[in-house]
Amino acid sequence: MKKREHLGLGFFEWQIILWLSIWLAISQQALGLRPIREKPRSWSDEWLFGRKQEAEVGPFSAWNITGTYRGTWKFLNSLNSSSKFQDFQKENGNSVVELVAVPTKITGVHYVQGVVVFHDVFDNEQNVGGAQINLEGVYIWPFRQLRLVANSGKESDSGQEDNNLLSNPYHLLGIFSSQVFQESPRDRLLKRKLSPVNEMEKHCNIEIAAQVSRVASSENNGDKNYYHMEGLMESPGVGDDGDCFSPLLLNATSVNVEVYYNKAVNYTLMVTFVSFLQVLLLIRQMEHGNTQSGAAKVSIVMIGQQAIMDAYLCLLHLTAGILVESLFNAFATAAFFKFVVFSIFEMRYLLAIWKATRPSNSGEGWETMRRELSFLYSRFYGILLGGILIMYQFHNYMQPILLLMYSFWIPQIVANVVRDSRKPLHPYYILGMTATRLAIPLYVFGCPHNFMRVEPNKVWCICLCTFMGLQAVILLLQHYFGSRCFVPRQMLPEKYNYHRRFNRDVSRTTDCVICMTAIDLRQHTSDCMVTPCEHFFHSGCLQRWMDIKMECPTCRRSLPPA
């Protein structure tokens, strides 16, 4: 008692000191759990918390913000006031953010890796267009706060990060379409190294502070939650260089990936249906020209060109199915039908045309025929592989290359004029193939909301339809009015006349070896036809015979077209 009085501390004083110690300990722990609320805020933090609504705090449930976000960006001050990166001159544009959030051992904190892609950033003179920046940071879900940074001077292989982050169908299909229709990975990497944003990542500390909110339930589709992020992107320079660019306002909403699943599945259903129609059209055409003479009238180049196109489509759909594993079944089905069209029907018809054009009385053995057949296959697959290399090297000119590939009716038009062929193709085959071949390119380059996210090009689509329609019209004119109906007579070669005059000094009659009935040669009428080898037949009999074989029924010599 004396000692306590000597210290000057009573029981009441000791109680106050004890409660103060407990309060300080609890407040320090609370301060550690609330680093964002209690630390000194920048003007961007004040803006961010000023826009936060009370209703957004709600119950403290962990939100999984992993996914793809698409939205817009714009400068707060309308223009970039910084002079360090003057190429950053656009006022606004589109942006895509890809985030992967992983829970940590710290309660309420998720570790986040991400990629932000800014479209329409630089002038067209840069030939870059957009900027891609790799980010990492934390998401503090009790306060719906997202903090991301991209440190300057950080050299890393972005390819491995892209493989880990950009793994959903939305981005994978975009990568696939950009590689096929727009640019190669080599050019994309070269542009990234030469891009001003590469220097930006080296000399700037990029910081993003965003507020995450849940999209209203009326805007949701299904049970999946969708989120909206709104925040600021600042880029203070390293040292005393000043800001790299003015603050950016980011707005992005999570993308409904199921929509892209459905679009991709609907596309594969369309390709499957189109392939089935092409099989029916090929069967109809093969029945139309099921004779040796009918098959010989068809251009082997025309069928081979279509077979190569279907082989390319088969490989493309199979590659897309392997790239996007969740859509493998849908794309593999489309690839299978294209494989059936290419390998079973078109290659079979190609061989029938090749056999019909070979002379049947050449007397060559099986070894010679097998050698010629091997040469045919070698040329076909050589052109197939060579075309892949050419398209890879000239991928920037994909649309002109497609126009060249869709000129497959031209070899048949030229063959009709040269051979004076008579109705080689069925009209249904001409119209059906023209329409079904246009389905895929019109979807890719004409549909504004295609799943590949290729920018529509209406002018090119109109040119393609006009080009294909003109070819089909010429083939139909040749079918109904003759193969050389549009060629001036002065340019036509001399044509053999089967109704030519013959020597009637000796009055005689002869038999038609086709129908075995007599032919009266004393009167020159259109009912009688004479071959270059001086054999006589009824007009109807010889025309039906030439539809099967272009050989004289009597002496087996080849006959000129009628």
From Swiss-Prot:
Residues 1-32 form the signal peptide. SMART domains: RING, RINGv. It catalyses: S-ubiquitinyl-[E2 ubiquitin-conjugating enzyme]-L-cysteine + [acceptor protein]-L-lysine = [E2 ubiquitin-conjugating enzyme]-L-cysteine + N(6)-ubiquitinyl-[acceptor protein]-L-lysine. Residues 33-262, 319-321, 395-397, 448-458 are lumenal. PROSITE patterns: ZF_RING_2. Its main location: membrane. It holds the Pfam family DUF2921. Its EC number is 2.3.2.27. It comes from the Eukaryota. The keyword Nuclease does not apply. A zinc finger (RING-type) spans 512-556. GO terms for cellular component: endomembrane system; membrane. The chain crosses the membrane at residues 263-283, 298-318, 322-342, 374-394, 398-418, 427-447, 459-479. InterPro entries: DUF2921 (IPR021319), HRD1_E3_ubiq-ligases (IPR050731), Znf_RING (IPR001841), Znf_RING-CH (IPR011016), Znf_RING/FYVE/PHD (IPR013083). GO terms for biological process: mucilage extrusion from seed coat; mucilage pectin metabolic process; plant-type cell wall modification; protein ubiquitination. Pathway: Protein modification; protein ubiquitination. It is a multi-pass membrane protein. Keywords: Membrane, Metal-binding, Signal, Transferase, Transmembrane, Transmembrane helix, Ubl conjugation pathway, Zinc, Zinc-finger. Disruption phenotype: Seed coat mutant displaying primary wall detachment, reduced mucilage extrusion, and increased mucilage adherence. Decreased degree of homogalacturonan methylesterification in seed mucilage. The RING-type zinc finger domain is required for E3 ligase activity. This is Transmembrane E3 ubiquitin-protein ligase FLY1. It comes from Arabidopsis thaliana (Mouse-ear cress).
